[in-house]
Amino acid sequence: MDDQVKMPTGPLKTCPICGKPAVQATHPFCSSRCRDVDLNRWLKGSYVIPGRDDEVDDVE
């Protein structure tokens, strides 16, 4: 068996936060810092998944 690490043959991915090349250890980010920035944005509600504004009926 071949124990060498295989390098990806496709285009290099970039970090969605800063645009630097992503690394495997923190994929798809370039560093733990960018990964934490992204998590913080999700937790603060900065990212929103679009949906419909349905009216909610009050159940009494």
UniProtKB/Swiss-Prot annotation:
Q: Which UniProt keywords apply?
A: Metal-binding, Zinc
InterPro entries for this protein: DNA_gyrase_inhibitor_YacG, Znf_NHR/GATA
Cofactor or coenzyme needed: Zn(2+)
Q: Where are the transmembrane segments?
A: none
The superkingdom of the source organism is Bacteria
- Cross-referenced Pfam families, in alphabetical order? YacG
Question: What is the documented function of this protein?
Answer: Inhibits all the catalytic activities of DNA gyrase by preventing its interaction with DNA. Acts by binding directly to the C-terminal domain of GyrB, which probably disrupts DNA binding by the gyrase.
Q: Which NCBIfam families match?
A: PRK01343.1
Q: How does it assemble?
A: Interacts with GyrB.
Q: Which family does it belong to?
A: Belongs to the DNA gyrase inhibitor YacG family.
Official protein name in the record: DNA gyrase inhibitor YacG
Species, as recorded = Bradyrhizobium diazoefficiens (strain JCM 10833 / BCRC 13528 / IAM 13628 / NBRC 14792 / USDA 110)
